[in-house]
Amino acid sequence: SFKEKSKNLDIFRAFPANKKISKFNSYFTGYFATVPYFGAVHENTFPPKNNYISLMKNHILEPVTIHGEGWINKWDVSKQTKNSIELVFKHNGKKNYPYAYKAKQTFKLKNKSLIISISLENIDKDFFYCGIGFHPWFNLSEFSKIHSNSFTYLKKIKKEKLIKSKMLKSNALDLNKYKIDETFLDWNGKSKLIINKNLSLIIKNKNNVNNLHVFSPPKKNFFCIEPVTNIRDAFYTKK
């Protein structure tokens, strides 16, 4: 688990003691990477060579395929030091996602920061659409709130029409009041997250991640704040 040591407070949601580490129990972890895309891929929306197809469902708790292969497969340790670790995952393109790729993920502790880096390398013979997402989970409290520069999202006004819309005018979103599953556009790469009255943190991205996804489901004791390169339902929206 990832904790604030001096106060023994969970930063990421702790893995349940009554669960075993397994492929499908990644759903209950405190963090995972989403590669080679973030979000769901609905039926007949994935466009290899401009032919729209469906991908196989990849998780028993989800109605459609979601978040790619990285979050439900083992990663190999390629490097390790006393304050960092590098993990590698290779997908051969033969099952579900039809392209081969190599993902690399590093975790580094520096002063009071956890630095997570993800890279994605195309090792297929063909070009393909891809994306990256950082998917941490946090425990919800009455104080949980995200301060960010943009709460602009794509709002569906007709079956085939989307427009940019602001969810709220202020720069603070109350995670108890707003129960949403939405990608916010034009993120400037820096947000302040208040988890509870004793714990807050700064989420930063140096470059190339322009969206911030907020998942705050009703009647649940958790939420997710996710820096992502592609918006939710990206292939459906593109189609």
Annotate each predicted stretch with a short phrase:
Residues 1-4, 89-130, 134-138:
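Acidic, contiguous internal or C-terminal segments within carbohydrate-active enzymes
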Residues 1-53, 189-208:
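Beta-strand-rich N-terminal accessory domains
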Residues 127-129, 137-208:
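Active-site/ligand-binding surface loops and adjacent short beta/alpha elements
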Residues 56-111:
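Extended, loop-rich substrate-binding clefts of extracytoplasmic carbohydrate-active enzymes
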Residues 26-28, 93, 102, 179-239:
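Beta-strand-rich recognition/accessory modules
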Residues 50, 116-120, 225:
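Buried hydrophobic-core signal for structured, non-transmembrane domains
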Residues 7-10, 46-51, 78-85, 108-113, ...:
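A short, structured loop/turn motif at beta-sheet edges
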Residues 37-40, 68-72, 98-102, 130-131, ...:
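Short solvent-exposed loop/turn micro-motifs enriched in small/polar/acidic residues
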